[in-house]
């Protein structure tokens, strides 16, 4: 079941459910549930649930769950759960759980758990647990647990 808004381009596998906003591009694997806002690009693997807000760009592996805020970029591995705020960039490995606040930049390895505050930068190795406050910078190796308060490095 697919709905393509004005000017949109939808390619969807069997058993998928999706809505493509105006002037958006939506590519969805079978059994997936997808919603793309206007002027967005969304490519998602099978069995995934993804929402791409206006102007966002989402690429997500199978079995992933994610929401990309307006004008954000989200790249997520399979089985991951991702949320990116507006104007943010989020790249995360498979099986990871990551939240990127407005204006933040996250790069995280597989199996990691992290939250990046507004306008912060978070780089985390696999299997790590990371929390960065707003305007902070956090780089951590695999298997580590780190908390960076507001404005910290």
Model-derived features with residue positions:
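Thr-biased low-complexity repeat/linker tracts and other Thr-enriched repetitive architectures
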Residues: 1-153
């Amino acid at each position: 079941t697919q709905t393509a808004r004005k000017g949109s381009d939808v390619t969807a596998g069997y058993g998928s459910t999706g809505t493509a906003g105006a002037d958006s591009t939506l590519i969805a694997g079978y059994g997936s549930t997808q919603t793309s806002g206007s002027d967005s690009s969304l490519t998602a693997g099978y069995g995934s649930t993804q929402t791409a807000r206006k102007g966002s760009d989402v690429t997500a592996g199978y079995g992933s769950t994610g929401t990309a805020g307006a004008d954000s970029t989200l790249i997520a591995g399979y089985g991951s759960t991702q949320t990116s705020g507006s104007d943010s960039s989020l790249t995360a490995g498979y099986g990871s759980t990551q939240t990127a606040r407005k204006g933040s930049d996250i790069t995280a390895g597989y199996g990691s758990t992290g939250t990046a505050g507004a306008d912060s930068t978070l780089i985390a190795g696999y299997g790590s647990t990371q929390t960065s406050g707003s305007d902070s910078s956090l780089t951590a190796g695999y298997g580590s647990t780190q908390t960076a308060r507001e404005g910290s490095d």
